[in-house]
């Protein structure tokens, strides 16, 4: 019957009812203090408490594999995956991406999923969060695999790939043994690279560390993060990159009241107060960034209550039909002239809104070009 999925709120009861011997912590993007607080609770209740090895849990592929991970959610993994994909395409390699799991429905049906077209996304009833990760790959002409059974997923991907890209989620460690491991570090959140689990592991085991978004970060914070990278992983190559932010129709934003919609996880467990959409609105000369909180309904209102750091920015939550409906209602009720969409997808495909939408894109740019391509060539 598989492993039962139970609420962590009931952990003490489950331990005592079943006389549990061991508890393994196996989710990501939480402060170190959270993990140890949980450990102290568990060992006080009786069982051993453990965290999983990064390397012993990796599946080996028969094809060259490049893993892209991060120290926190919302650093720029997906844009880096696209950047590396384009390098491989230029080298004449057939690329297949495997995305970190985001299963919310029938897990048996989602064991091994393959996405090549938008119709595939519809057929698998993908959430907004899944679409945010899959659509950019499809737009670039790449097949994406995801699901639950990551042994069978990689074996299917190997049948059609010269090179496999692991597109990591949250700040989790790779599920596959990489030939090249790239980790993104965020100067907008200096110190988080040493204080979040398991992101610090990625920092310490990577071959290439990318300090991203240096074009929008304070110089002293960039230097702090660079120093932490070199101290934690002295054998890694460390480079700086820009995240180049572009609005497709900046004229819709200039002088207008803008409602900024950002990638949900970046604003929620990622802990950010802004994202690419906020920068795009500022760059385009928005007269005002409208606070959506007073107009939020249902699940969106609950998200603001749980994550007050989101501030005036609207997180694009869409894990189910009700959240999508609440997102649409919140956008339509907010008195703005334009929606600045900082998510990686086109919301117009998902919801119907009563305002024009300016879509924002963000792409990786090496400050000193050439290092990433050189390291990619070395493993393929």
Describe each model-derived feature in a short phrase.
Residues 34-55, 168-169, 357-375:
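Repeat-unit-sized solenoid/scaffold elements
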Residues 34-38, 60-63, 108-109:
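Short, conserved acidic/polar surface loops in the N-terminal third of protein domains
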Residues 9-18, 66-69, 79, 86-365, ...:
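Flexible phosphate-sensing "switch/lid" loops adjacent to ATP/NTP-binding sites
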Residues 1-55, 324, 335-346:
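Phosphate-bearing ligand-interacting subdomains
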Residues 46-70:
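Flexible, Lys/Arg-rich cytosolic regulatory linkers and terminal tails that connect or flank
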Residues 37-39, 81-84:
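"Short basic amphipathic alpha-helical interaction patches in structured regions
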Residues 75-76:
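Conserved glycine(s) of the Walker
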């Amino acid at each position: 019957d598989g492993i039962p999925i139970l609420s962590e709120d009931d952990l003490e009861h489950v331990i005592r009812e079943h006389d549990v011997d061991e508890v393994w912590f196996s989710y990501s993007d939480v402060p170190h203090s959270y993990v140890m607080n949980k450990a102290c609770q568990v060992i006080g209740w009786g069982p051993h408490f453990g965290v999983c090895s990064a390397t012993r849990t990796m599946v080996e592929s028969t094809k060259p594999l490049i893993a892209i991970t991060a120290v926190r959610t919302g650093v720029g993994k997906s844009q880096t995956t696209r950047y590396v994909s384009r390098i491989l395409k230029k080298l004449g390699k057939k690329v297949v991406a495997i995305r970190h799991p985001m299963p919310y429905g029938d897990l048996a049906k989602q064991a091994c999923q393959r996405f090549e077209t938008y119709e595939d996304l519809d057929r698998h009833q993908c959430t907004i969060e899944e679409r945010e990760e899959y659509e950019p790959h499809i737009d670039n002409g790449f097949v994406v695999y995801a699901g639950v059974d990551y042994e069978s997923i990689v074996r299917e991907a190997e049948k059609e790939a010269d090179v496999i890209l692991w597109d990591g989620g949250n700040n989790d460690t790779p599920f596959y043994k990489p030939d090249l491991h790239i980790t993104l570090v965020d100067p907008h959140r200096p110190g988080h690279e040493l204080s979040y689990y398991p992101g610090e592991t990625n920092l310490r085991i990577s071959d290439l560390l990318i300090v991203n978004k240096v074009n929008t970060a304070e110089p002293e914070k960039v230097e702090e993060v660079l120093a932490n990278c070199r101290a934690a992983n002295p054998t890694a190559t460390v480079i700086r990159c820009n995240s180049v932010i572009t609005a497709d129709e900046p004229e819709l934003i200039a002088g207008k009241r803008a409602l900024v919609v950002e990638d949900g996880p970046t604003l929620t467990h990622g802990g950010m107060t802004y994202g690419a959409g906020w920068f795009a609105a500022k760059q385009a000369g928005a007269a005002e960034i409208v606070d959506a909180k007073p107009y939020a309904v249902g699940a969106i209102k609950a998200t603001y209550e749980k994550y007050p750091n989101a501030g005036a920015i609207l997180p694009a939550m869409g894990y189910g039909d009700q959240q999508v409906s609440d997102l649409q209602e919140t956008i339509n009720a907010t008195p703005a002239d334009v929606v600045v969409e900082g998510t990686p997808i086109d919301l117009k495909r998902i919801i119907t809104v009563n305002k024009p939408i300016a879509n924002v894109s963000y792409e990786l740019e090496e400050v000193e070009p050439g290092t990433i391509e050189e390291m990619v060539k070395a493993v393929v």
